[in-house]
Every structure is written in C-alpha cells, then in structure tokens.
C-alpha cells in the first residue's frame, strides 16, 4: 500500500493501492511554515468495509486520519493525473465550455491579460443561462495594479457587468491581519507576508481539479506544477463548500461607472475584518469548523471496493482564533511511518523551506529519503529585480544546511531543471508533494 499526499491548500491526502512513482515530480503539497498551535477536528467517517484488506500500518494511519478529516472513497478511474501545463489549461477550458450548472474557481490571482480564459467563461455563461459562476481570489494580489493599470479585478469585472452579480459572484479575500496604517506603508510586493488566499480549486459541475497552479500564462505553458482531476460529486461538493465558506468571509466585486469597487455584503457571515479583528476571527472559526467536519454523501454506493481513500485537509490558520487546521497533523502522522526500517520517502518542493517538525521526522527516521527541489535556474525568482532576486540562493543555503544536518547517505537531494527560467524554452518548477511507502 502506497501513500500519496497532495495539497492545494486545502489539500487531499490519498491512501492508494498503487500509483506510479515516476509521477512524483507532478505531485504537490503546500506546507505551512513557522511554529503555531493546532488542534484536530474530529469527524464521523463510518465503517470502511474493506478496512482489513489494507496493510496493518496503513490501517493505523486510517484510524488516525479518520479523527482529523472526512474520508472519501474513490475507485479506479475517479482520479486523472494531468502531467503538463498545456494539458491543464486545455482541460480546464474544455470543462468550462461543457458546464451545465456551476463553475467555481479559487486562485491566488488570474493573470491580468488572460482574455482568452475570460472569453471562455463568458461563452459558457451565454451558452447556458442556468450556469452560476463563483470566483474567489486574493484581494491584495488581484488589485495590486489598480486603479492605475490593469489587474485581475479589472479583467473579470466585465463578467459581472454583463451577466449580473446573481450569476457571477466574484469574491476577494482580504487578510484580517493587514489594515489601516500598516497596509498603507507596506509595499504591495511584500504585503503577502500578512496572509493571503492561496487555494487553487477549479470545479465544474461534479468534477474538480486540485492544483498548485494559478490562472496565468506561465502556469499554462512552462511552469511545471501538479494537476489532479477528481471525478467525484461528493468531493466536488465538499470543495465547493470550502470556497463558499471562505467567500462568505470576503469582499464582493461590484461594477461601477469607474470600473469596480469592493463591497462587504450584509449577508456575509462576519463583519468586516478591519472593524474588529477578534470578532472576525471568532465568526470565521464558527463558519469554517463545520465545513472541515462535514461530509455530505449523495452518490450511490456500488459493490466495488474503493482502492483510494481521499482525506481533504486544510490550512486556514489566519482565519482561526485557535488554529484548527488539519494539514500539519495529517502530514506528521504520515511521516511517523518513517520510523519503520524499510520505509521510503520522496518529497518535492519548488522552494526548499521545510517546516521544522517535518524536517525533524525526516532526519530522525529510518527511511531512505529522496528530495526533489527546483534548481536556482528553475526558481521563478531567478535573476528577478530587488530583494526577491536573492531568494534562489537563500533556498540553496537552506538546502545545504539541511544536508549538513542529515549527514547520511539515506537522504538524497536532487535539483530539477529544464533550461533556464525566463529565457527561451526555460521552465520553472512549482511542484510540492510527499510520497511515503511503508515497508513490506
């Protein structure tokens, strides 16, 4: 029994019978960095009929994960792995144009010149008047250039203008931890350190693509990421619920004669964050915890035993008064398998910056570990202007420190490179993930 872990923040945790290890560099997970408190969110997943067919170590993992996150049972054919950014983009457009009832997209931002994608969304809305479009992006990133230049917000505002906010619901999440004088003096390229909307959820009807890719040109052409297409109504509903919950804690884009403005709807589930941060965090905790706990099953069960269990786990640290995020407990539980001799770990990260608890599990474990990271020439910040240009070397330094601490032939680090980023035929690397194989 192999273990596969990917994240779109929120992310699913897979337990799968068999998956091809050659696809590891397509797998991804985002790790929350820094020290913080967390508490598990317990759920009732019911009995798994083929529980005893799993590896004994896997059974122990299933029991613990069942106390953290809802479990979704999938069978062969319910998951399609997309390997190339062009395939991801073409698949997304194809799904959108065939939509029958809903399109829901969560991303950090949409590239400000992605006119083709906006036209595809518009065509789908024109073609089928029953479709509802929901978009969730980060407010700071999506209005960075406004009002003096084009931005994500100005790009997608015409969809609201044409189809109305009852059909096109565009939400912009604003971190509760940056407002007032602090926001006015913080450079726009640095304000992300206070928090942002980083989910990448691309759902159409009863299918959902989970990825680490934003909706912009490099992610559609020459930035290697990971893309998982889930053909599951229940899982799609779950992620639609996640997006809906965060949207209810976000601003709504409203069009005006001057372009657009951000409004806080009266039916939102919290007051504006800058008015009372503590109250906002209490409200957002009340809204999000049930979403993490709840699983609504609508699909008809079959006699076929599932070969893959999916546990969606999430990081909502900035929105919890007492952090109830589920991703770190899940990752650490999986990494406890490294204590068994004969276990294997493959990990990949575009940016080498390992959480201290994860690093501790790797260094003290008995497993053979292989880590794939971006070479400096595959780092999107390579030769960029300003302080960000120092980041590739900083990640190399972090990697060297890690290797000095490891001091073991059981830990191997590989650098991914395909040409030189920002030059002809050069790619960047953005995949992040974990794959643990238990012994036996």
Regions found by a protein language model. Give the residues of each.
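Extended catalytic-interface subdomain
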Residues: 184-191, 204, 210-211, 240-290
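A general structural motif
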Residues: 319-331, 351-354, 425-428
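Short hydrophobic/charged patches on amphipathic alpha-helices used for structural packing
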Residues: 93, 332-335
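PLD/PLD-like phosphodiesterase catalytic module centered on the HKD motif
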Residues: 2-93, 97, 115-209, 213, ...
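Active-site cores of enzymes that catalyze phosphoryl transfer or operate on phosphate-rich substrates
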Residues: 41-86, 252, 264-330
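A short acidic, Gly/Pro-enriched loop at the edge of an enzyme's catalytic core
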Residues: 100
């Amino acid at each position: 029994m192999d273990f596969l872990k990917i994240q779109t923040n929120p992310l699913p945790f897979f337990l799968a019978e068999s998956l091809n290890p050659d696809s590891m560099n397509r797998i991804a997970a985002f790790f929350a960095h820094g020290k913080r408190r967390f508490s598990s969110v317990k759920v009732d997943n019911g009995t798994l009929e083929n529980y005893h067919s799993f590896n004994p170590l896997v059974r122990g993992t299933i029991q613990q994960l069942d106390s953290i996150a809802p479990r979704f049972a999938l069978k062969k054919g319910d998951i399609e792995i997309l390997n190339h950014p062009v395939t991801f983009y073409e698949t997304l457009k194809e799904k959108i144009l065939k939509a029958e009832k809903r399109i829901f997209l969560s991303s950090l931002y949409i590239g400000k010149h992605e006119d083709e994608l906006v036209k595809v969304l518009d065509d789908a809305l024109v073609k089928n008047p029953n479709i509802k479009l929901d978009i969730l992006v980060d407010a700071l990133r999506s209005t960075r250039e406004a009002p003096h230049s084009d931005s994500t917000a100005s790009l997608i505002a015409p969809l609201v203008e044409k189809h109305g906010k009852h059909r096109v619901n565009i939400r912009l999440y604003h971190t509760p931890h940056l407002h007032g004088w602090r926001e006015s003096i913080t450079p726009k390229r640095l304000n992300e350190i206070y928090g942002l909307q980083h989910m990448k959820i691309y759902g159409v009807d009863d299918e959902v693509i989970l990825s680490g890719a934003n909706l912009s040109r490099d992610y559609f052409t020459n930035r290697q990421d990971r893309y998982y297409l889930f053909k599951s109504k229940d899982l799609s509903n779950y992620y639609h619920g996640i997006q809906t919950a965060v949207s209810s804690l976000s601003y709504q884009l409203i069009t005006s004669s001057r372009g657009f403005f951000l409004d806080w709807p009266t039916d939102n589930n919290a007051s504006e964050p800058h008015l009372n941060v503590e109250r906002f965090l209490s409200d957002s905790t009340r809204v999000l915890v049930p979403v993490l706990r709840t699983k609504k099953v609508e699909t008809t069960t079959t006699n076929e035993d599932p070969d893959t269990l999916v546990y969606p786990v999430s990081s909502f640290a900035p929105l919890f008064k007492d952090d109830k995020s589920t991703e770190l407990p899940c990752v650490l539980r999986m990494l406890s398998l490294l204590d068994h001799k004969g276990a294997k770990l493959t990990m990949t990260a575009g940016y080498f910056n390992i959480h201290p608890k994860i690093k501790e599990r790797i260094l003290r474990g008995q497993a053979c570990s292989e880590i794939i990271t971006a070479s400096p020439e595959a780092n999107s910040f390579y030769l960029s202007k300003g302080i960000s240009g120092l980041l590739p070397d900083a990640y190399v330094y972090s990697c060297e420190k890690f290797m000095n601490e490891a001091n073991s032939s059981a830990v191997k680090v590989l650098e991914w490179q395909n040409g030189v980023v920002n030059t002809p035929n050069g790619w960047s690397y953005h995949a992040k993930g974990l794959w643990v194989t238990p012994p036996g």
